[in-house]
Regions:
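N-terminal nucleotide-binding beta1-loop-alpha1 segment
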Residues: 1-19, 245-246
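Short catalytic helix/loop segments, enriched in acidic residues and glycine
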Residues: 20-35
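Conserved beta-loop-beta/alpha segment of the NTase-like Rossmann-fold superfamily
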Residues: 61, 66-137, 141
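Conserved alpha/beta core of the MobA/IspD/sugar-nucleotide pyrophosphorylase nucleotidyltransferase superfamily
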Residues: 1-3, 161-248
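Conserved N-terminal catalytic core of the sugar/cofactor nucleotidyltransferase
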Residues: 2-5, 31-98, 186
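Conserved beta-strand segments of alpha/beta enzyme cores
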Residues: 24, 69-71, 207-209
């Protein structure tokens, strides 16, 4: 199993907190956000890790020198495209095998992560079933399967928020790559990665089960209030895993 971490963006909505570092280098309880994600991957036996970089890429390259199994892939167009563009830059480096997809600035309870990695389905999507705001990556489901994922879903129709990490099966990977290439050829530079997921769902023939977060911790650091939430609520179990793997 391999992993791809999306880490190209600057995080400008965090103000001067990201003037000199990418947001995944912000710390919570002594460890950087990126360290927590790397430790979760190692804890689950995943050591082949690709990080798509952009803003302050040199810091990630230095990080890769300190850890075996990490490869950095630079997206020179990170300031002019969204996440799908970064995935496009990296997809030729990804084998068609089970893959964990995640964002460098998103953390979750270790139990959610483990359940996702062990989950069965072609695209296993952790979802926080709750009332969503306009900016949330919202989902609609049928019989436990995601049928629509988009920020454009009306808030009143949404069942919950996709937390931005997923397990992609070996079967789904070629379809995800093909959908990404198609969207890029169509000039969809501002598309989210979920646009490729939706294309695969629409194609049919793939199981896309949800994994409920069940009110367990997760957090995406986009704004200063998000950062405060993560620092105040980060689970001890996640910190302990980071401690255990800090020298990997």
């Amino acid at each position: 199993m391999q992993a791809i971490i999306m880490a190209a963006g600057r995080g400008s909505r965090l103000g001067n907190l990201t003037d000199t570092i990418p947001k995944a280098f912000l710390t919570a309880k002594e460890h950087r956000l990126i360290d927590y994600n790397l430790s979760l991957l190692h804890e689950n036996g995943i050591d082949d890790i690709k990080i798509v970089t952009g803003y302050k890429a040199g810091l990630y390259e230095d990080l890769a020198k300190e850890h075996a199994g990490i490869t950095c892939i630079y997206n020179p167009f990170y300031a002019h495209c969204n996440v799908l563009g970064s995935f496009y830059m990296a997809q030729n480096e990804l084998r068609d095998e089970d893959t964990v997809y995640l964002h460098a600035d998103t953390l979750c309870d270790p139990a959610i992560f483990e359940e996702m990695v062990q989950g069965t389905g072609d695209i296993v999507m952790p979802v926080d079933f709750k009332t969503c705001d306009k900016e949330a990556m919202k989902v609609i489901t049928e019989a436990g399967q995601v049928v629509k994922v988009s920020k454009e879903i009306p808030e009143m129709e949404a069942e919950g928020e996709f937390i931005g990490m997923a397990k992609l099966s070996a079967k789904a990977m070629p379809a995800i790559k093909a959908a990404t290439r198609k969207l890029m050829r169509e000039g969809c530079l501002n598309s989210y990665f979920e646009g490729a997921i939706q294309a695969v769902i629409d194609e049919g023939g793939y199981r896309v089960p949800t994994l409920s977060t069940e009110k367990r911790f997760w957090g995406e650091v986009d704004f200063e209030e998000d950062y405060r939430y993560v620092k105040d609520n980060l689970p001890d179990a996640l910190w302990q895993i980071a401690e255990r793997h800090k020298n990997d």
